[in-house]
């Protein structure tokens, strides 16, 4: 991990991920989590204030970046919620099979290097009746914006921690063996269109 990724990127991501439009999106999905919860890519812990502590019996936070885990731990203390941290990547989840009731993924799929492998790992640890709550940005539906996304993405990935702009959220989920039960979409207000097309909702493992 280079100097930029270790020391400069974490505070930048912390600020961006704490923006009001993104916070509003988090509030739409995180409170639904219940039981034993696995959050993929906890980052600096921006979801933590929105968990319903009366519904969550155990919270596991997967976050490979040590500086982000430090920020998340501080935020967990402020929120009064316990978190069991693991530094593994989404592709390498080391939890027992069928042990998770809810998976929470917000603004994370865009940075995962091997999405199919991560989807397989996530599905393995989910109980048969478990749900995935997701809120992600991705490929825009209008071609004009999508063209700009494709042009910008090579540079964007280098400065934004490997963030991809052109991943279609619905296709990632269905190709990964999930069935979308509910999904809404919109362009986030106050956000550049190339990074602002959001999809959020709930998915389950396909039969």
Short names for language-model regions:
Residues 16-36, 46-50:
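Conserved alpha-helix/loop element of class I SAM-dependent methyltransferases that forms part
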Residues 101-115:
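A short SAM/SAH-binding and catalytic strip from SAM-dependent methyltransferases
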